């Protein structure tokens, strides 16, 4: 057993032996990461649609693993991790897998799980960390309520587990911010220390005045 696994196992024992009884006695909730064995570091990608999240992932992994397009291309979360071959697993399969700490996602309901996917591919980068791609924010007036599952709760779940949150924003579409602002101020509350905002496509502006005029 590696040194990392030994330390992780010992930390989990301390949580179960000391912190969990204390949490129950004092009626406070342990963070998600304290309840489950730590795995690979993971990065969560958020942002409005067509902001470049999936394109960035494809560039990083040097393969077209995620669909891209000007219009919204997906309505679910996708976990990307290392595997010996390219494969895709559905939400029900991965939440019942004993080696994956995703059982807590069951409470988000079948509509969420039906849109959840895990993709494996033989990328050397994914031996060191996992990626979580999210559907683009729906910023049209009233459109955010058309999702058939609790998107904000899904964001919170993955954000709590994430070691880094990359929030892509397209400055060429400054009006598309309704759900984006809501996610920034609610599900990500208290997790700002993990957050990095990326102004993607900003190089398309000729100067700062052109950027400001949008």
Where are these regions (language model features)?
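Conserved G1/Walker A P-loop phosphate-binding module
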Residues: 1-139
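Conserved C-terminal guanine-recognition region of P-loop GTPase G domains, centered on the G4
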Residues: 101-138, 145-214
């Amino acid at each position: 057993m590696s040194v990392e696994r030994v330390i992780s196992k010992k930390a989990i024992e301390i949580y179960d032996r000391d912190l969990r009884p204390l949490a129950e006695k004092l009626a406070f909730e342990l963070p998600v990461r304290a309840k489950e064995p730590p795995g690979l570091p993971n990065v969560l990608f958020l942002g409005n649609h067509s902001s470049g999240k999936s394109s960035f992932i494809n560039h990083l992994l040097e393969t077209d693993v995620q669909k891209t397009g000007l219009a919204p291309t997906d309505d679910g979360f996708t976990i990307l991790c290392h595997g010996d071959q390219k494969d895709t697993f559905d939400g029900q399969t991965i939440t019942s897998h004993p080696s994956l700490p995703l059982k807590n996602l069951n409470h988000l309901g079948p509509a969420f799980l039906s849109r959840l996917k895990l993709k494996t591919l033989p990328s050397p980068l994914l031996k060191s960390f996992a990626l979580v791609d999210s559907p683009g924010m729906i910023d049209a007036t009233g459109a955010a309520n058309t999702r058939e599952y609790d998107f904000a709760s899904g964001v919170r779940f993955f954000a709590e587990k994430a070691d880094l949150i990359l929030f892509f924003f397209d400055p060429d579409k400054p009006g598309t911010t309704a759900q984006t602002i809501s996610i920034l101020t609610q599900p990500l509350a208290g997790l700002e220390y993990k957050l990095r905002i990326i102004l993607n496509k900003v190089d398309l502006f000729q100067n700062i005045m052109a950027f400001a005029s949008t």
